Amino acid sequence: QGDTLALYGDYLFYDGNTQIAQVRNNVRMENRTTTLTTDSLNYDRVANLGYFFDGGTLMDEENVLTSDWGEYSPATKMSVFNYEVKLVNPQFTLTSDTLRYNTATKIASIVGPSDIDSDESHIYSELGFYYTQQGQAELLNRSVLSNGGKTLTGDSLFYDRNKGVGEAFRNVEFIDAPNKNMLTGNYCHYSQNSGYAFATDEAMAVDFSQGDS
């Protein structure tokens, strides 16, 4: 496919029967846009799959990912990371114990408890997608968006970091702790820039500012 794979290391052990290469010390696996570095890598030529198990780093044009264990397929551009996972982008940091990431699309697939932190917000999610190039998230399973003492949650959540807009759908709850009020409904729109939020579809507003809602 015009995408050459290069594999470097201090020591190489290759089994011709299984076609598995074990590379140790200062290991580097590179293709055109992606570099994986570790001290212990096994590469399966049949499956075209490299995996590390003693800590590693995957870097592309957008993001740097580190974890204790991981695997990367140069053919599909898919990678899987487990244990102490961190994705670092100039705009945000995503931490998790399990994460899938595609180096072609730059989409991170959240499949376990994860935190996404930026200067603008904090997101907690256990399931969904983060489009790292676009700065957008599509999240499920009661994910939570927090910003300046305000939290937005719903059965599903959409967030656009560049626009500073969050939208929640079904069984929505927006809590404004500084102003002591809450919105509920089945849809809520929240603008971080203006601090404005509104809810629709069985919407209800609750004011706690007087000590009696």
For each of these PLM feature ranges, what is it?
Residues 1-213:
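Structural signature for solvent-exposed beta-strand/loop edge elements and short helix-capping sites
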